[in-house]
């Protein structure tokens, strides 16, 4: 069986053709602009195999987004520290992803729960072209500890299958993107389950797709490894998308190469 390698192909493309660029963190990158990857979720769960990816952090982060939370305490209580570098002394991050997903502020002072709205629309009007969730709230960005990197996603229904396309304006290919791929693939499974649909495709669209200069050695090592078949996902069904727990998510037959450590650009 041929193993799909869209992620590794993108790493190779950026290594071979990327433009050297300065960046907000002062680290420096190789970058390409505009790229798309696609996975058929019926063919396996897209958890990268050329290095071990920390599934616990991915699942808890997604559940944290779905809680509408903006404080790292719940993550820390569950052993996840991936947001600690950006939090203030009280653990606050400002109106980041979960806040925008669950309580987007309106000019009238009300709030929109985009996730609830999305699932309701998928059930009542699945052919709508407006089934979109945005974390990119221009008015709130100055109050965010970090502007949304994965900013906007859209759902699409065809033949009883739910597909999701994510737009990621800034893509840290070595550290961040493997998390983002798995997170949104899992979210697609959850939303499909709640809407009575089968999972379709997950499409990842990247804007500034970059490899940090201090990740080049790690990427070189990763690309020397043979990709392995993707695992599969078993997801317990819950009454509501907000009821899922870590224990409801089981990844089966995740075969992978060893983890590769690298510094985070803050």
UniProtKB/Swiss-Prot annotation:
Sequence positions that bind (6R)-5,10-methylene-5,6,7,8-tetrahydrofolate: 54, 172, 265
Assembly and oligomerization: Homodimer.
Name of the featured protein: Thymidylate synthase
EC assignment: 2.1.1.45
Tree of life domain: Bacteria
Catalytic residues (UniProt): 149 (nucleophile)
Pathway: Pyrimidine metabolism; dTTP biosynthesis
Database matches in HAMAP family: Thymidy_synth_bact
GO terms of molecular function: thymidylate synthase activity
Amino-acid positions noted as binding dUMP in the UniProt annotation, renumbered to this chain: 24, 129-130, 169-172, 180, 210-212
Any one cellular-component term (Gene Ontology): cytosol
Organism from which the protein derives: Rhodococcus jostii (strain RHA1)
GO biological process, one term: dTMP biosynthetic process
Family listed: Belongs to the thymidylate synthase family. Bacterial-type ThyA subfamily.
SUPFAM superfamilies cross-referenced by the UniProt entry: Thymidylate synthase/dCMP hydroxymethylase (SSF55831)
């Amino acid at each position: 069986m041929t193993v799909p390698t869209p992620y590794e192909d993108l790493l190779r493309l950026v290594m071979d053709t990327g433009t050297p660029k300065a960046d907000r963190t002062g680290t420096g990158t190789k970058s390409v602009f505009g790229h798309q990857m696609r996975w058929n979720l019926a063919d396996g769960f897209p958890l990268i195999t050329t290095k071990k990816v920390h599934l616990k952090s991915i699942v808890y982060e997604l559940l944290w987004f779905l809680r509408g939370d903006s404080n790292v305490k719940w993550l820390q209580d569950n052993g996840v520290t991936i947001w600690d570098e950006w939090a203030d002394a009280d653990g606050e991050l400002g109106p980041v992803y979960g806040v925008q997903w669950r309580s987007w502020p309106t000019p009238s002072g009300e709030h929109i729960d985009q996730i609830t709205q999305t699932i309701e629309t998928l059930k009542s009007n699945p052919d709508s072209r407006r089934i979109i969730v945005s974390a990119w709230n221009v008015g709130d960005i100055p109050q965010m500890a970090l502007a949304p990197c994965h900013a906007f996603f859209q759902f699409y229904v065809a033949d009883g299958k739910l597909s999701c396309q994510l737009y990621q304006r800034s893509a840290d290919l070595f550290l961040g993107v493997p998390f983002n791929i798995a997170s949104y693939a899992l979210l697609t499974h959850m939303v499909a389950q709640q809407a009575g649909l089968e999972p379709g495709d997950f499409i990842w669209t990247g804007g500034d797709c970059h490899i940090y200069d201090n990740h080049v050695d790690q990427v070189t090592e990763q690309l020397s490894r043979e990709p392995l078949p993707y695992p599969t996902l078993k997801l317990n069904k819950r009454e509501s998308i907000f009821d899922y727990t870590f224990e409801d998510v089981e990844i089966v037959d995740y075969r992978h190469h060893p983890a590769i450590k690298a510094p985070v650009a803050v």
